[in-house]
């Protein structure tokens, strides 16, 4: 059985394909073990730590991720993996475990960066004003 899921965070979008296999996890056709920095890799593999690593040996997960930076991509990937595992196994207990740990494992974080406006260096900050 093949399951397609996706995850989003900021401008990063991850599309995951979960299929029966022997535990390979690939990010952009590269083994997840080669992902740097390590913090991003650990974030991506959180769903396996919560579910128990026995699930990882039964499935192959191929993920294509684009957009954003490494932190946003890591969050998008972990959402895609968690959704894929829940959908692939159809396990309500697994879904509840993910939801209890962190709701963003199953639900996309829709917050976006506020755009810069004129009259200042950022969205809310204004340029310094001088009276003399």
UniProtKB/Swiss-Prot annotation:
- Which SUPFAM superfamilies does UniProt cross-reference here? Ribosomal protein S5 domain 2-like
Q: Which GO terms describe its cellular component?
A: cytosolic small ribosomal subunit
InterPro entries noted in UniProt: Ribosomal_Su5_D2-typ_SF (IPR020568), Ribosomal_uS9 (IPR000754), Ribosomal_uS9_archaeal (IPR019958), Ribosomal_uS9_CS (IPR020574), Ribsml_uS5_D2-typ_fold_subgr (IPR014721)
- Kindly give the PANTHER family that the UniProt entry links to this protein: RIBOSOMAL PROTEIN S16, RIBOSOMAL PROTEIN S9
Q: Please give the Gene Ontology molecular function terms for this protein.
A: RNA binding; structural constituent of ribosome
- Species per Swiss-Prot/TrEMBL record: Halobacterium salinarum (strain ATCC 700922 / JCM 11081 / NRC-1) (Halobacterium halobium)
- Which key words tag this protein in UniProt? Ribonucleoprotein, Ribosomal protein
Q: Tell me yes or no: is Cell inner membrane among this UniProt entry's keywords.
A: no
User: What is the official name of this protein in its record?
Assistant: Small ribosomal subunit protein uS9
């Amino acid at each position: 059985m093949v399951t397609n899921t996706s995850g989003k965070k900021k401008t990063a979008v991850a599309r995951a394909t979960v299929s029966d296999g022997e535990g390979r996890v690939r990010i952009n056709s590269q083994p997840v073990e080669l992902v740097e920095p390590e913090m991003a890799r650990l974030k991506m593999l959180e769903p396996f730590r919560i579910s128990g690593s026995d699930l990882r040996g039964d499935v192959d997960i191929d993920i294509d991720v684009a957009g954003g930076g490494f932190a946003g991509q890591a969050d998008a990937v972990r959402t895609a993996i968690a959704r894929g595992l829940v959908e692939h196994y159809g396990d309500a207990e697994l879904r509840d475990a993910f939801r209890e740990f962190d709701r963003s494992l199953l639900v996309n974080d829709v917050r976006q960066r506020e755009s810069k406006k004129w009259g200042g260096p950022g969205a809310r900050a204004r340029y310094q004003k001088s009276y003399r």
